[in-house]
Amino acid sequence: MNFKIYNISDQAKGNFNSGEILENKPIGFPQDGGKLKPYSNLFYWAHAWTNNKKSTVGLHPHRGFEICSFVLRGKINHFDTKLKKWIPLSKGDVQIIRAGNGISHAEEFDKNSEIFQIWFYPNLEKSLKKNASYDDYSFSDFKIRKNDKSSTTIIKGDGSPMRMDTEGLIINIHDLKDGSHLFKSTKQKIHSIFILDGEIEIENKNILKGTFINISQTDSFEIFCNKKSTIFEVISPLTPSYKTYA
């Protein structure tokens, strides 16, 4: 099993508007200086939040990528040049911009709000020729699978309405009770996991809130929770079938 840990200190840092919006970036831009570079069909992953003041990232352009925002806490408002109106999003909601041949957007963070923004690689040779499109998904749109030890919100995968052109993605949020949890995989997949809350253990290594890990080249792995924990998981191809520039 290939298992790597990226602590908060290993992640790139960023901010907007003189620190009104703060960021840790498990996968940053090349100039950001974090330890982890793009891989699989993941190009960029930012964990962004505000404290006691709302703040806006002004209108800026995108092309090619599929850019997803996952609202973890609070509220954001989104504007783009496709819909030409502000759209509110709350905790648990997800937005996707299929940037295609070009779109510009702006984001307003309410105070005490928190998101992931993740850029995924579709096949750029195809996506750059498509018109841009945009969808919002409410938390209530997503299927939740429960058992005695965990609850899993399926954001992208079996039974999810979320449409993406990026190949081979599964996106889950797992709420895990204390104890042992077995995750199945294949050697063709890589699991990218962010610890949203709590504390977990893998191969006798203690992993705290805010830490990012990836796991690959295994048919299964075990996560032990020392207490109730929440993790955000993206499963993607170890080697996509198309060029990604990663």
Describe the predicted segments one by one:
Residues A12-G14, P30-D110:
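Extended, compositionally biased flexible segments
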Residues N15-L59, E66-I67, I115, D141-L182:
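A short glycine-rich, His/Asp/Glu-containing loop-to-beta-strand
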Residues P61-N77, W119-N123, I173-L176, T186-E201:
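Short, conserved beta-strand element in jelly-roll/cupin
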Residues D80-R98, E201-C225:
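Short acidic-glycine-tyrosine-enriched beta hairpin
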Residues I96, A106-R163:
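Surface-exposed beta-loop interaction hotspot
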Residues A99-K126, N206-L208, S216-Y245:
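Ligand-binding loop in jelly-roll beta-barrel domains
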Residues S160-N214:
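Hydrophobic secondary-structure block in the mid-to-C-terminal portion of proteins
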Residues F183-S185, K243-A246:
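Short conserved micro-motifs at the rims of enzyme active sites and ligand-binding pockets
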